[in-house]
Amino acid sequence: MGKEISRIRLNRLYSESNIFEEISFHDGVNIILGEKYDDSSVKGRKTNGVGKSMSIEFLDFGFLNDYEKSRIAKIPKEVFPLEENVILDLDIGDEAITIKRNRKQADQPVIIREGRTVSFDKLQDAREYLTGLIFPKLNGKKVPSFRNLFSILMRDERSEFTDIIKCHDLTKKIPDDLSAHLFL
């Protein structure tokens, strides 16, 4: 099965003008933890408001989520300019991939594959392109989308982490989909 699905390795997430702090990923499982900001006591230090959820939102934006449903859409343009590119560097199989996306043209991402730039007019076309890279030998067969795969690994905090199958916002009535679980 490992030969039918290309390995995905995240390398780094950043913005073109360094508006947010770059996140570098390491091989294996990566956990985003907040740095404790209350140094007055060792016990009970607070990690609220240090950017854990927004880091996940930026990562999800890089993975081509629906911009309108994202918390990134709510950031004032004075804080995060609409033209600022969010850049995600990753490897799919043996190929270096860079995904560039900004809020002004959120539905028109750019994917750089081994130095060659591919621009998309529709978000869905870019998603299908990435799905084809992840499942190169399963073309034409029913496979989960790469967005489906990542919903398991990068869970929405509104899923309440209570059910391994329900990895989406529990306030939405989304039917259970086991396909991504079966591929992992």
Where are these regions (language model features)?
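A general boundary/transition motif marking the beginning of the first structured unit of a protein
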Residues: 47, 118, 138, 168-170
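Alpha-helical scaffold elements adjacent to nucleotide-binding pockets in ATP/GTP-utilizing enzyme cores
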Residues: 55-58, 100, 125, 129, ...
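Short, charged, low-complexity patches
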Residues: 48-56, 119, 123, 174
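Gly/Lys-enriched N-terminal cap/neck module of very large, oligomeric protein machines
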Residues: 87-113
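Extended, Lys/Glu-rich alpha-helical coiled-coil stalks
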Residues: 141-184
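Extreme N-terminal "head/tail" segments of very large remodeling/mechanoenzyme assemblies
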Residues: 1-95
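Glycine-rich phosphate-binding loops of NTPases
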Residues: 104-159
